[in-house]
Amino acid sequence: MMRLRGSAMLRELLLRPPAAVGAVLRRAQPLGTLCRRPRGGSRPTAGLVAAARLHPWWGGGGRAKGPGAGGLSSSPSEILQELGKGGTPPQQQQQQQQQPGASPPAAPGPKDSPGETDAFGNSEGKEMVAAGDNKIKQGLLPSLEDLLFYTIAEGQEKIPVHKFITALKSTGLRTSDPRLKECMDMLRLTLQTTSDGVMLDKDLFKKCVQSNIVLLTQAFRRKFVIPDFMSFTSHIDELYESAKKQSGGKVADYIPQLAKFSPDLWGVSVCTVDGQRHSIGDTKVPFCLQSCVKPLKYAIAVNDLGTEYVHRYVGKEPSGLRFNKLFLNEDDKPHNPMVNAGAIVVTSLIKQGVNNAEKFDYVMQFLNKMAGNEYVGFSNATFQSERESGDRNFAIGYYLKEKKCFPEGTDMVGILDFYFQLCSIEVTCESASVMAATLANGGFCPITGERVLSPEAVRNTLSLMHSCGMYDFSGQFAFHVGLPAKSGVAGGILLVVPNVMGMMCWSPPLDKMGNSVKGIHFCHDLVSLCNFHNYDNLRHFAKKLDPRREGGDQRVKSVINLLFAAYTGDVSALRRFALSAMDMEQRDYDSRTALHVAAAEGHVEVVKFLLEACKVNPFPKDRWNNTPMDEALHFGHHDVFKILQEYQVQYTPQGDSDDGKGNQTVHKNLDGLL
């Protein structure tokens, strides 16, 4: 009786509008049929809180909105402004190209709408089993565009454009990302040409995303290096606010162009190796790289000339001395490329035999590629001031010339001019974070995918940044923070977390070592919170956060959604879960699988799908040692019992396992699409 009452209530909930759901839930008895009452005892049932999580529609639907995403308007004009104006319309040929990864439908007629049965629910299912794996794959694997549509739509027939953009931003991608240009162009064209411009049906959505489907699928499947990017950025914002309270330090004033910056300026930008972006504070204010350019020009020199040639002229050791000392090592070479003497020598190695104008253009083009074509400028006023107040650097230059540290035929005065020019190159926190991410990504720019630097150049650059990048504070920074970094007198700190992300922290007030006060505090706090230190143990860490791991909440939701789809007989939802490489054998707290629930409810289509398409183990035991066959027999579902019995001859039991080994082949096929 309880079971009939619960089923009727569920139907009522699904048919009522959202406004009526709350009142029904308050009157409702707990849904007991998801975890059946065992024979000979009782079992805990889910409360209202669990019920509200069973389906996104009950909890309000949608994704958590991050900062900057919540206020996005749904009006066509403001969405157009968000997507950017202008741009070349996509070619007609692009609109008609085949969907990547698409396969022909298993049978004619509309499929995939929530609640409908698929090919496994009719006589065609038997033909598929007889025909083998090929047709099963066709039934299991519709196009990736379909999967993406249903992931965002959450049961609706159309997707509002602003909802898609908000969901996209929550993954860390930006609408200005060069990799998404075709998608954004098509969205803009759709908004301008359709009558219902702010809504996308499935066909329009597929046209918009098909050229960028792999990247978008990775984003929404949370396959980026930082899966829960919204949670990570909330931590970054907290660290930013903590560092903002730091006072002290003095703005560099040896030239007027540096002295004019307000000590209250403070910005942090993050770019991961997958192109996830986050910025907070004064991240669009241009400032000069100053000494932050030293590792970049060293990387250019090694990329062009090789390690062996470059280190004929400059060493690799920390000097233990001030960065502008007139001092060489025992071989009469500068100690490393991060002190002024070494940086001047490295400058002389770039594009030898070419005039300064061509050299400067070459380096600017290189830095533009590293920054993904984001802002890289030049401050002529800073250059003039540096040259006029550069007596110490001229002294170092003449000392190097006297010790024959330059390649033969080098014009020392011309090289110093070029050196001052490179120090006067301007960036913003946002563009510099992409440069740092290029170093973190092995020389590939994360937002363009272009290889800019060789692996050798990246490895050597990060090694020297780690040991020599923070002036006289380098040893302490390596000890406490343990990450490659380079600071500059303009207040910037270029920070690299190898294989994860790059960051630029900028605040003009400097400590007595010449490093940004707020930037140093931020870096210390970051490594205290996250296990990014070079020697943090990734397997046995106790208290630190690892943003590279997916949180437990997502796994809990995964189990709830899987079992609820099996309970309601929603084969379309199960197909989407299988497409997203979900473990279809995962269990709840009673060790019950989706097959247990489907067998108890008598959903023939779901049982067939799980057995024939997903190849799940038909013999899992729950905490009461009941198998799906026991469930079907107990509730009188003889057709399900017969299917499970027949499937025994096709399946070799692997034992009760929680790791979903029976799904490995399907998972490999799914991941192969990406």
Curated annotation (Swiss-Prot):
N6-acetyllysine, modified sites: K316
PTM info: Synthesized as a 74-kDa cytosolic precursor which is proteolytically processed by the mitochondrial-processing peptidase (MPP) via a 72-kDa intermediate to yield the mature mitochondrial 68- and 65-kDa subunits.
Residue ranges, compositional bias (Low complexity): 89-101
ANK repeat residue intervals: 590-619, 624-653
Region of interest: Highly mobile activation loop: 320-327
Record has Repeat as a keyword: yes
Keyword Disulfide bond: no
Residues with site note (Cleavage): L72, S73
Gene Ontology MF terms: glutaminase activity; identical protein binding
Domain notes: A highly mobile activation loop at the dimer-dimer interface is important for enzyme activity.
Role this protein plays: Catalyzes the first reaction in the primary pathway for the renal catabolism of glutamine. Plays a role in maintaining acid-base homeostasis. Regulates the levels of the neurotransmitter glutamate, the main excitatory neurotransmitter in the brain.
Official protein name in the record: Glutaminase kidney isoform, mitochondrial
